Structure formats: structure tokens, C-alpha cells
């Protein structure tokens, strides 16, 4: 007589915890909801991401809480609203005194405590600090290879974006040191040769995975790609190949990197032992026009709380564990820490988390526990609190404000010239019928249906409850700047920033 089913399930659960999955978390930069082939773009060359979508779970309603680099990355790694941690307003810069507070617990720290070999490649943008105090090696990552902030946060005239010697478009940030490439806390090059950067990241990733396998331990790879942030770059194999200009070439290289990672995982025989998650930090920077990406049918882009700013492509791939399909369940980047902790059998940090465990949804045993989503502006304050709230199919905008990042679209509500506006009653949209947020259901409240009025009450209550519950942490950005904190490959040299130049040997 066979063992009872309950016993078999318990044994299977025990084995899952005893051997947690390898995890690869891929985070694209300034990628629009409509930029991938699997999300409907007619000409994007993204076969590897499309293959992940076909073989895994594709999310249609996956969100970030803030549509800007620094706060979005903080939310991803901690499962907490950025305002709780002081990751506001705007973004950190190379000379910022502040950064992701060290008392915050990152997903890397959660997994490292479970025995994972943890590594990060790519863009950090959560602060540098004195002696690199806020960098990844102090935030749970055993290994780090990357740029500590955005690659436009330095002078672009000394950057090569396309081989053999095409300079990057625009001036970027003048008066700063050249962007540094760091290996853990050491400067590898300043500036790096961008066309060769992706190959270095892929070699780093392969070494991490292979070393973890040799050590018989799981790995966590956080690959925070610079693609498709402006100014776009790519290697020789992709330059002028996409038919979609520099943005398309950059996207093509990102997709190829995903393919390289999947090939490496397969070559190591780890496909069925590795969970791969792909998403992005915020919507497209439409002010760049053809270099800015596409939000598809969604309204606006980066820097706004409209759908084009906060709704992101998201894929989860794990053969033998995640069934192929599409889910319309609500999900957020905030949910990744509790989800990965559950799958790894790791305890949650003893802090207030704003994320939910999505493992039942991923594994096909249940639905998403998330019932609502909250969206903050790039420059939040405690007086106004949350700008927009979604529950079920309804979304309310209590405040709106345009952003320079979303300039040049045909919709003036997206532009920086669209000033902060309070809405009473709020703008209310049925996203199941109107994902573009074009038809306000409360344009005439007297004609609103009972269902719509009930949704309005629920959304107002959710906003009031969250605003009352959330305490803003001291702003890390408001700690100000110290030019001496900028990383320099020749510490103490003069004159700065010109002397901080160490040619890349890989160029």
C-alpha cells in the first residue's frame, strides 16, 4: 500500500525547502509595457524573452510603486514602500551622502542567510556613501560587478556607446567624475567601454553559477541591466541591427543577454532547478522620442503614476514548476522578496513588508493574495500621501502630475507642464475596459452606477488607511551631496573630475 497523499506532499515540501531553487532576477531599465514582442510590439527583436514568456508565466498586471530608478530598485530589493526607507524625493546622484539604509534587509541578505551564493551585475543606484558604505557588498551580495548609478550620471563625451568609436548621444551630467565600473569595491575602469560591458556581465554571471554548483549551494543572481536606459549602447553584434535605432539595438542586446544566461543555465544542467524572473524598474522615458521606448496602449510613461509609468512587463520561468500561461492577477515588484523567501524556505525579516507571497500563483496552487496597489509620485510628501490606488479592475487618481521624463507624447497630461493637480472626486478608471485611462467614470458622478460608487468608496478608504499607516522615513536624498564622495580611480588626485580617468583595458 502506498504512502498517504498527505505524507507524499509533506515529503515533497520538505525536499523543496531542503534544496531551494537557484534564482535569476533580471531587471531592465526604462522598459515600456509595449516594448517586447510578447507584449505586442510588432517589430521588436526579442526572441529570447518571447521564449521565456511562451514557456513561463506572463503577467499582464504587474506594477512598481514608483516610476523612477532609485525608489523602484529599493522597493524591489526590500519588499517595502520606498517612502518608509527615505528613498525619496527623486533619485540619488554620484555625490549623494545618503543611500539604502543598512538596517534595511534586502532579498540578497535573506537568501545569503539561507546559504545562497549571491551576486549582482549591472546598475545599483541605491547610493555609494563614505568608503562605499551603501554599495552591494554591504547589502547582502557576495559579489558585485557594475556601475553604482545610472550610466548617464557622468559626462557622456568620454563614453563610447557603439563600436568602434561612436560617442554616446547627448552631454549627460557634466562636472562629475566619469562613470566607474566596480568589481566589489574596487574600480575596474573609469569609464568602462560600454560596448563590451554586457559580455563582462555574462562572464561574471556564468562564474557565479558555476562556482555555486561546485560548492553545492544555490545561487541568486541579480542582473540589473543598463538596457534600455538613455543613452543606449550595444556591442558590435547588435549595432544598427534592430531596425529600431539605438533603442532597438540596446533592447536586442538585452534580449541576447537573457539568451546567454539561459544557455549557461542549461549547459550547467540547472534549468529545472532555476527560477528566472524578468521585469523592469519603470515605464519608458518618452521624452527621448525614438530613443525612449513604448508604453503600448497605456497612458504616459516614466515619472508618472499613470499606467504607462507603473505597469511593467513581467515573466516567471521555471520548467517543471511554473506552468506556461498568462495571468491577470495583481502583482508588484514589492512581492518578490516574500515570494522568493517562501520558495527558498527562508524566514522573512522582522519589519513591515508591503509585499505578498506569490508562490501559490507561480506554482499553480492558488491566486495572488494582493488585492490592491498604491502608487507614489517621484517627489512624494506626507501631506498628500498616495497619488493613485488600484483595487480589482478599478484605479483612482487622487492627484496627478506630469513629468519631464514623459514629455513629447501627444497627451499633455503626461508633460512636465502638467502641474500637480488634486482631484475631488478622484479620476476613476475601469482598467479592464480602459487600460489607457481615457474615460473617467466620475466625469458625471450623478450618472455613476452603484458598482462604480462602491468602488470609489473602497478606493478612498484604502488611501486613507495606507496614508494613516505609513510613516515616511528621513529622506536619504535630502541628506545632500558631498563631491568628495564621488568614486575616483585615483583617490586624492587633482584636478577633479578630469584626473579620475583610468582607461578600460577591454576597450
Swiss-Prot record:
Changing residue 244 to C: In MLD; juvenile-onset. Changing residue 489 to G: In MLD; late-onset. Changing residue 68 to P: In MLD; late-infantile form. PROSITE patterns: SULFATASE_1 (PS00523), SULFATASE_2 (PS00149). GO terms for biological process: lipid metabolic process. Changing residue 425 to T: In MLD; juvenile-onset; retains about 12% of specific enzyme activity; the mutant protein is unstable; results in more rapid enzyme degradation in lysosomes; addition of the cysteine protease inhibitor leupeptin increases the amount of the enzyme activity; displays a modest reduction in the octamerization process of the enzyme at low pH. Gene3D superfamilies: 3.30.1120.10, Alkaline Phosphatase, subunit A. Changing residue 244 to H: In MLD; infantile-onset. It comes from the Eukaryota. Changing residue 426 to L: In MLD; juvenile/adult-onset; mild; common mutation; decreased enzyme activity. Glycans are attached at residues 158, 184, 350. Changing residue 381 to E: In MLD; uncertain significance; early-infantile form. GO terms for molecular function: arylsulfatase activity; calcium ion binding; cerebroside-sulfatase activity; sulfuric ester hydrolase activity. Optimum pH is 4.5. Changing residue 350 to S: Often found in association with a nucleotide substitution in the polyadenylation signal downstream of the stop codon; this association defines an ARSA pseudodeficiency allele found in individuals with low enzymatic activities but no clinical manifestations; no effect on activity; no effect on protein abundance; loss of N-glycosylation. It is linked to Metachromatic leukodystrophy: An autosomal recessive disease caused by abnormal intralysosomal accumulation of cerebroside-3-sulfate in central and peripheral nervous systems, as well as other organs. MLD is clinically characterized by leukodystrophy, progressive demyelination and a variety of neurological symptoms, including gait disturbances, ataxias, optical atrophy, dementia, seizures, and spastic tetraparesis. Decreased arylsulfatase A activity is detected in urine, leukocytes, and fibroblasts of affected individuals. This is Arylsulfatase A. The lineage of its organism: Eukaryota, Metazoa, Chordata, Craniata, Vertebrata.
